[in-house]
């Protein structure tokens, strides 16, 4: 089984699914004379065991309460002496508490000593004890332990603390994970001086007690051996260490036999899954069943299973393109349920228990719960959505899909695209999503906290088979926004409940003795109608701890008097500080100090936890306190910490990875408000906002944590915390130095499939630095230069790389390539063109690499370089790298590819890139289509690769096989549905629409459907552009949008040529023109082609009977029937980085149009009989025109001047209206007429003029059309073009230029 799991993980290059692993926390029991053994184990053995546990998904941490370190100091304040006395009185009780918490793990060290005990003890009645001070320390410990859950200690009062611990751990309970280590000594080898000292001790008063102790320890050892407990005997520290390491390694192996954690794997998602499971388990322990809870359970279940097929293993019907391209219509059913109520009413506990109950009764239903309060670092909306996507895809597709930092999935960092992926994921199978605590959601990477909370990002129509259950505080923005939606059903949770329920909740959190003692509190609870479950839980848990330090009944009265949860927390925080804390300065703790949060280590701990990004471990907090100055007699010992944690265990809980966090948001709010003094949540605060005195305190704690983690060496902890605190402190130089440091860069670049959280925060820090004006790229280059400088004296051969000098031999080839790919991803994501220079210098090295062991890394590098050249328009160079990668891949058989998922992935990418860039001859000679068909059979279990291969096959299908192409596109849709539904599906939708257009050439019934598909693609791209923050992402989205606009215009112009369709098409062309001028430059060749097309449309619309004219112009069966706009939808301008393709195709079509028009001279004369401007609205030609056309249209301008001012429509990218209310079309002023025309030459000629290309072949028009349809044509290099012929359009005359200027002046009016 283990081998199968490892093989499966390697096959899919995915991480194993981590399960809830209970941490191994043995309690260390020994007498005071074992300090050397404890130190040796803590420093040498336990770290080894923790490393061993780390590979199994858990951790090892021994609990060692060393009371010897607890000493009173003469400089103590009165409050500290009180704390010291109270702490000693609960010595026994505290130890037994931790024995229980560590069960079933226990380590006992025994020697010749027994420990302190009461030799002549007289039993006393607990009820007769009036004053604890009247008892001895031993009696105080017995009294406190007996009153707090351990009454059995009074039955054997003459035992030592060590024996009490052994009784509780091993005699009263049974466990196979308990080990006893007996220290042996040779009593025969004694000197004469030792014998004389023993004779003197016999005469002392303590001799008899010591002798009794030796007898007792002997009996205790015999009892341990008699019970068959595992006992080991050791003579020295090394022997003890070997025994402990062997025994507890076997325990780890027995409990967690499979190695779950591997190096260079990001397990963030798996750990999040564990956090939610742990949260549910904690809520189950405190849940109280009531009438209200049963009623809510029934409502939740009715909502969840309504219209839901309980067999979630079946896919959703209707997985075609129409279901993918959903139109946001009004919902026919309510697919969202909102459970709301006041804070502390028990929403989270109720939902967690309902989720557990529902899963147990309906195991076949796909349910994904997410509790925002279960972890403090993953409360941003993008992490939440990504968690849902990963869980849904895992259930639908098997192993989790990899999320490569360098692949196309980087666009999930665009929030709107992530939502598209989410919508695709919930369409896979019937599912139930549960999101608890939505008012705590925060934004990140351009998403504001308000946007995250108001749920405006959630589409108005969810699939009927998806049920979304949310919970929120009634007064929150989330609740108010969701209540306004028509598809939301609201359920209000009554927080008060009946009296029996209140008392049950109160008793649930009390120990058995306390339940009897506080039974008399029932009448008091009845008098307080404002007690919600959170208040009752807080009061009950406090009463069990506060009685050691003060009168519990007085505390109860104070707690019951407060009106709100926040006021109750203020009282509890005040008690924690007074009873457990002390300040660094010698001054009494006052109420003012407590409220201001200015004193005490407890205050510092709470503030540090609140400020931390992902939580802090116990060891980290104690080390930070020591760094802050809590040393010597101010030192916070393990015993002090244990007492504090015992009181806060219900509210400061430990995650499965050992980090502490606030269990309830109300505690975090109280700490932020009363101790930090901030009004804005720490997680939503902006470091750039001006800081007042209270914010300075917050910044101080950020700086403390920053200083601490700068000294740490564990990468993941440093990465989680250090850059966060640098950002929040505004320390931009340090943040830039951190993310560009060689150590951090090297580690991150080696991570396989980094989680979204890891990538998101890295890119977020890059984005923050760019906004702050830092040059992150230069920092990267300087960092690499430092590496080179260290080895410059040893190496002679150097390779110059983009302004820096690197030594691949020093870095090792694999490490060099890894760093290169990481830096490429960084540059590409930031839209930096210097990536080109980077790879230009690296190319000689890449070519020289011949090691077979580096083939996978080399393939990845070659693919990355080729794609980079593809993006910047250097198609031929990109193709060169794709061909090299293809040659390297041919060394492997299909069987080899099947074994290695990484090789298969690179194979898929290479074929996809070749299909888009290689010539038809290369594809035929290398049988790429046949090879792609064969490879597709091996990727059936990976939806992403399967979708990519099907898309590649579709691109490679010859043009003549139109019906096969369309059928292939239909078969691709379900695969896309199973994949991501993001950028790849957008490409396929656009390509599929082109296939529908080809079918339109034979049947026009499909044209309307193609138009709708294009409009949906435009909406998707517009939404993506509205939230894109990366310049490269935004540029590509806008270029892609321009392509789709042109295609849609071509679809409209290929129809019935009605006035409305023509106006709409022209508006799309002008929008495309604006986008292309903005992102490709006004001199780009494609702009000239679009402008020529617009002029021809305007000239044609100058005639009165468009449909009739077009029918006459292109009679049925004519070889010229393929007009310029019929071919327009087949163009893809996304790759118009190459400056020839668009202009070539456009001008070829224009040439055909003019030739066809010249064959019908009588048509123009017929049209001249109709007076323009009357009857149907016409296009007013305002571009270049002849003198005759100018004269014919002079009356139009005269009539238009008399009309009222035209209203301007609103179009994306700040373009002016292209169609006025009379149907006149005007060029975009922003793009076309923005420059002066004083030179007499029109702007269109002076800026947009490019040489025109040859026309389509009149003999074989299908050959040219096939080139338009083929995807590879879309990525031609600048050298690919037809043989230039004489320009179709001569240079404009001065009359045309003046006419153009007149039109411009008229627009100004």
From Swiss-Prot:
Keyword Cytoplasm: yes
Gene3D superfamilies named in the record: P-loop containing nucleotide triphosphate hydrolases, Tetratricopeptide repeat domain
Keywords from the named record: Cytoplasm, Repeat, TPR repeat
Record-linked InterPro entries: DCAF12 (IPR051191), NACHT_NTPase (IPR007111), P-loop_NTPase (IPR027417), TPR-like_helical_dom_sf (IPR011990)
Subcellular location: Cytoplasm
Gene Ontology, cellular component aspect: cytosol
Start and stop residues of the TPR repeats: 399-432, 651-684, 817-851, 859-892, 989-1024, 1042-1079
Keyword Repeat: yes
PANTHER family assigned to the protein according to its UniProt record, in alphabetical order: DDB1- AND CUL4-ASSOCIATED FACTOR 12-RELATED (PTHR19860), DUF4062 DOMAIN-CONTAINING PROTEIN (PTHR19860:SF18)
Protein name, UniProt field: Tetratricopeptide repeat protein 41
Organism this protein belongs to: Rattus norvegicus
Phylogenetic classification of the source organism: Eukaryota, Metazoa, Chordata, Craniata, Vertebrata
């Amino acid at each position: 089984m283990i081998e199968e799991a490892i093989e499966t993980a390697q096959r899919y290059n995915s991480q194993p699914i981590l399960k809830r692993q209970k941490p191994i926390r043995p309690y260390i029991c020994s007498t005071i004379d074992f300090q050397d053994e404890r130190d040796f184990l803590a420093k040498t053995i336990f770290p080894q065991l923790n490393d061993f546990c780390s590979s199994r998904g858990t951790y090892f941490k021994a609990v060692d309460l060393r009371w010897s370190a607890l000493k009173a100091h003469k400089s103590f304040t009165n409050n500290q002496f009180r704390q010291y006395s109270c702490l000693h009185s609960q010595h026994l009780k505290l130890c037994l508490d931790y024995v229980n918490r560590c069960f079933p793990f226990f380590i006992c060290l025994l020697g010749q000593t027994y420990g302190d005990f009461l030799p002549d003890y007289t039993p006393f009645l607990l009820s007769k004890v009036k004053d604890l001070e009247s008892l001895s320390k031993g009696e105080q410990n017995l009294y406190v332990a007996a009153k707090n859950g351990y009454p059995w200690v009074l039955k054997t009062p003459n035992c030592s603390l060590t024996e009490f611990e052994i009784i509780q751990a091993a005699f009263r309970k049974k466990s196979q994970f308990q080990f006893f280590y007996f220290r042996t000594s040779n009593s025969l080898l004694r000197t004469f001086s030792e014998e004389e000292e023993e004779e003197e001790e016999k005469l002392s008063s303590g001799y008899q007690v010591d002798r009794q102790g030796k007898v007792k320890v002997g009996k205790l050892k015999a009892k341990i051996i008699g019970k068959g407990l595992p006992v080991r005997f050791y003579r020295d520290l090394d022997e003890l260490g070997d025994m402990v390491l062997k025994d507890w390694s076997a325990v780890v192996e027995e409990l967690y036999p499979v190695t779950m954690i591997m190096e260079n794997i990001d397990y963030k998602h798996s750990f999040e899954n564990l956090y939610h499971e742990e949260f549910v388990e904690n809520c189950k322990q405190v849940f109280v069943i009531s009438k209200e809870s049963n009623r809510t359970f029934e409502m939740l279940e009715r909502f969840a299973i309504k219209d839901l097929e309980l067999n979630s293993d079946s896919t959703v019907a209707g997985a075609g393109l129409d279901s993918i391209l959903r139109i946001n219509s009004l919902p026919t059913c309510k697919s969202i349920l909102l459970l709301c109520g006041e804070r502390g009413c028990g929403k989270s506990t109720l939902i967690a228990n309902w989720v557990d109950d529902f899963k147990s009764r309906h195991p076949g239903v796909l349910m994904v719960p997410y509790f925002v309060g279960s972890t403090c670092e993953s409360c941003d909306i993008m992490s939440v959505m990504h968690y849902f996507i990963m869980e849904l895809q895992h259930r639908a597709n098997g192993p989790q899909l990899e999320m490569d930092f360098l692949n196309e999935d980087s666009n999930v960092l665009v929030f709107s695209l992530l939502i598209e992926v989410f919508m695709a994921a919930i369409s896979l199978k019937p599912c139930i999503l549960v999101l608890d605590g939505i008012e705590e959601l925060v934004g990140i990477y351009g998403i504001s906290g308000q946007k995250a909370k108001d749920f405006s990002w959630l589409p108005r129509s969810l699939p009927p088979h998806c049920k979304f259950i949310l919970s929120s505080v009634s007064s929150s923005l989330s609740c108010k926004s969701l209540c306004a939606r028509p598809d939301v059903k609201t359920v209000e949770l009554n927080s008060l409940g009946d009296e029996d329920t209140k008392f049950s909740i109160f008793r649930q959190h009390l120990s058995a003795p306390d339940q009897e003692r506080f039974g008399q509190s029932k009448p008091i609870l009845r008098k307080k109608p404002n007690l919600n479950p959170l208040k009752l839980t807080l009061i009950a848990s406090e009463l069990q701890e506060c009685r050691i330090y003060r009168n519990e009944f007085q505390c109860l009265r104070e707690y019951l008097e407060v009106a709100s949860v926040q006021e109750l927390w203020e009282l509890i925080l005040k008690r924690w500080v007074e009873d457990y804390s002390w300040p660094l300065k010698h001054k009494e703790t006052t109420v003012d100090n407590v409220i201001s949060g200015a004193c005490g280590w407890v205050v510092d701990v709470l503030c540090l936890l609140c400020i931390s990004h992902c939580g802090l471990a116990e060891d980290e907090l104690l080390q930070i306190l020591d760094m802050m100055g809590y040393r010597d007699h101010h030192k916070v010992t393990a015993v002090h910490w244990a007492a504090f944690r015992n009181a806060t265990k219900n509210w400061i809980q430990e995650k499965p990875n050992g980090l502490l966090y606030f269990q309830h948001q109300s505690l975090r709010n109280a700490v932020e408000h009363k101790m930090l003094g901030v009004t804005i949540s720490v997680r939503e605060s902006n470091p750039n906002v001006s800081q007042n005195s209270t914010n300075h305190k917050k910044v101080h704690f950020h700086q403390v944590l920053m200083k601490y983690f700068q000294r740490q060496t564990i990468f993941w902890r440093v990465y989680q915390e250090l850059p966060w605190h640098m950002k929040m402190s505004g320390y931009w130089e340090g943040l830039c130095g951190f993310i560009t440091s060689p150590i951090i860069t090297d580690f991150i670049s080696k991570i396989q499939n980094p989680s979204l959280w890891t990538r998101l925060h890295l890119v977020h820090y890059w984005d923050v630095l760019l906004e702050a004006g830092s040059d992150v790229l230069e920092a990267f280059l300087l960092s690499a230069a430092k590496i080179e400088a260290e080895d410059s004296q040893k190496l002679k051969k150097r390779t110059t790389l983009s302004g820096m000098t690197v030594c691949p031999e020093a870095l090792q080839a694999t490490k060099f390539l890894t760093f290169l790919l990481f830096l490429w991803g960084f540059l590409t994501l930031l839209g930096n063109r210097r990536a080109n220079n980077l790879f230009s210098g690296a190319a000689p090295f890449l070519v020289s690499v011949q090691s077979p062991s580096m083939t996978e890394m080399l393939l990845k590098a070659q693919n990355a370089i080729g794609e980079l050249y593809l993006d910047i328009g250097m198609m031929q160079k990109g193709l060169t790298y794709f061909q090299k990668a293809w040659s390297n891949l041919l060394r492997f058989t299909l069987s080899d590819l099947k074994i290695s998922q990484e090789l298969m992935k690179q194979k898929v990418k290479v074929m996809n890139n070749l299909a888009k860039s290689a010539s038809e001859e290369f594809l035929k000679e290398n049988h790429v289509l046949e090879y792609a068909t064969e490879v597709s059979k091996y990727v059936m279990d990976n939806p992403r690769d399967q979708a990519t291969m099907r898309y590649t096959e579709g691109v490679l299908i010859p043009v003549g096989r139109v019906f096969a192409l369309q059928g292939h596109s239909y078969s691709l849709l379900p695969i896309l549905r199973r994949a991501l539904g993001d950028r790849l599906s957008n490409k396929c939708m656009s390509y599929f629409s082109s296939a529908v257009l080809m079918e339109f050439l034979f049947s026009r019934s499909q044209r309307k459907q193609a138009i709708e598909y294009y409009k949906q693609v435009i909406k998707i791209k517009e939404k993506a552009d509205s939230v894109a923050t990366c310049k490269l992402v935004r540029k590509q989205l806008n270029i892609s949008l321009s392509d789709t606009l042109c295609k849609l215009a071509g679809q409209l112009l290929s129809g019935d040529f009605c006035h409305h369709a023509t106006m709409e098409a022209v508006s799309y062309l002008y929008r495309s023109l604006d986008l292309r001028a903005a992102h490709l430059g006004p001199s780009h060749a494609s702009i000239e082609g679009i402008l020529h097309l617009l002029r021809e449309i305007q000239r044609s619309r100058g005639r009165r009977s468009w449909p009739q004219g077009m029918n006459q112009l292109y009679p049925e069966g004519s070889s010229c029937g393929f007009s310029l706009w019929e071919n327009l939808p087949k163009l893809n301008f996304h790759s118009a980085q190459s400056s020839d393709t668009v202009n070539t195709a456009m001008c070829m079509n224009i040439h055909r149009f003019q030739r066809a028009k010249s064959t019908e001279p009588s048509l123009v004369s017929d049209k001249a009989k109709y007076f323009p401007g009357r009857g149907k609205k016409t296009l007013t030609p305002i571009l270049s025109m002849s003198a005759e056309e100018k004269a014919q249209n002079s009356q139009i301008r005269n009539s238009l001047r008399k009309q009222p001012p035209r209203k301007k429509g609103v179009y994306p990218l700040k373009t002016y209206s292209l169609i006025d209310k009379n149907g006149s079309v005007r060029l975009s002023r922003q793009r076309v007429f923005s420059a002066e025309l004083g030179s007499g030459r029109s702007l269109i000629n002076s800026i947009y003029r490019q040489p025109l290309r040859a026309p389509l072949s009149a003999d074989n028009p299908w050959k040219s059309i096939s080139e338009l349809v083929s995807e590879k044509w879309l990525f031609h290099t600048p050298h690919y073009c037809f043989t230039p012929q004489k320009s179709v359009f001569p240079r404009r005359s001065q009359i045309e230029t003046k006419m153009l200027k007149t039109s411009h002046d008229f627009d100004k009016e």
